[in-house]
C-alpha cells in the first residue's frame, strides 16, 4: 500500500513539474520581460543579432549569459 501511494505521489509531482514548464501561449506572444519563457530566450539567442554585438563567432546569448563554443 505504501509503495503504491509513494509511486502515485511521485508521478503526480513529476507530471506537475512537466506541465508547469510547458508554455501555455503561442511562442509569438512571449513577453521578453518574463524570464520563465525559456524557449523564447533560446530561440532569440540563436537568431537575434545586434549591431554592436560584442559576441565573437561561435558565441551565443542565452538566459545564463554569453556562451562561447
UniProtKB/Swiss-Prot annotation:
First and last residue of the signal peptide: 1-21
Prodomain positions: 22-57
Tissue specificity statement from the Swiss-Prot or TrEMBL entry: Tentacle (ecto and/or endoderm tissue), and possibly also nematoblasts.
Swiss-Prot/TrEMBL keywords: Disulfide bond, Nematocyst, Secreted, Signal
Disulphide linkage map: 59-68
Chief location: secreted
One Gene Ontology cellular component annotation held by this UniProt entry: extracellular region
Tagged with keyword Kinase: no
Record localization: Secreted; Nematocyst
Tagged with keyword Secreted: yes
Task of the protein: Peptide with unknown function. Has a limited effect on human peripheral blood mononuclear cells. Does not show activity against both Gram-positive and Gram-negative bacteria nor is it active on the 26 voltage-gated ion channels tested.
Misc. remarks from the entry: Shows a propensity to bind albumin in aqueous solution, which opens up the possibility of using it as a carrier for directing albumin binding as well as potentially increasing half-life in serum.
The protein's name in its UniProt record: Peptide Hact-1
Organism of origin: Heliofungia actiniformis (Mushroom coral)
